[in-house]
Regions:
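Glycine-rich beta-strand-centered segment in the early N-terminal region that forms part
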Residues: 1-17, 27-78, 83, 132-136
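Conserved active-site and cofactor/substrate-binding residues in soluble primary-metabolism enzymes
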Residues: 38, 42, 114, 118, ...
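Flexible, glycine/proline-enriched loop segments at strand-loop-helix junctions
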Residues: 59, 109-111, 139-143
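Mid-domain Rossmann-like dinucleotide-binding core that forms the NAD(H)/NADP(H) cofactor-binding site
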Residues: 121, 128-130, 134-180
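Cysteine-cluster motifs in flexible loop/terminal segments that predominantly coordinate metals
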Residues: 67-128
């Protein structure tokens, strides 16, 4: 079962989801994660409903999910260091006493992988865990932007310090390698 959107949450109809190697690591038990859980973190979909405080998106908007969600108002976020958000573990999840976003029919909570769980027909996520995209962008391609594309691009630009016009060799031609 999936809950109703809280004040800063968005309900999304999943249109496409990529299978990342990170998902495979969790499925194989190489990375610990509490079960039951719904995996998946590369996804695109269409907004179905929004919480009372959400103003960035509205029903019908096309969106991609972001695994690097942030609160938007702590000192790290306001200083432009979104990946260092001080409130990731508190504000982006439901609090004790609140109904879970995902649950089994008996009410048992189901954990959300990276606060997303895109291997489901619908996702209920924090508003800061998505980005609105142009309606003309194919959702089956857009879903790869949230992890593989930004990981490959970030590896080339930030880790390898590659600049326009330079020649590089990329070893591997998966989604990340092709995006580097």
């Amino acid at each position: 079962d999936i809950g109703e959107p809280g004040p800063r949450e968005v309900l999304i109809r999943t249109a496409a989801a990529g299978l990342c190697h990170s998902d495979l690591h969790f499925m194989e038990g190489k990375y610990p994660f509490p079960c039951p859980a719904v995996l998946g973190h590369e996804s695109a979909g269409v907004v179905e409903a929004v919480g009372s405080m959400v103003h960035y998106v509205q029903p019908g908007d096309h969106v991609i999910t972001c695994l690097s969600a942030f609160c938007g108002h702590c000192s790290q976020c306001t200083d432009g260091h979104l990946s260092l958000c001080e409130n990731k573990g508190t504000e982006l999840v439901r609090q004790p006493g609140e109904p879970p976003r995902l649950s089994r029919s008996g009410g048992e909570p189901v954990n959300q992988y990276l606060h997303l769980s895109s291997f489901a027909e619908q996702m209920l996520i924090h508003e800061q865990a998505l980005v609105k995209i142009d309606r003309d962008m194919p959702l089956d391609k857009a879903c790869l932007l949230g992890c593989g594309v930004v990981t490959g691009w970030g590896s080339a630009v930030y880790a390898a310090d590659v600049h326009p016009g330079e020649t590089v060799a990329v070893i591997g031609c998966g989604g990340i390698g092709l995006s580097a």
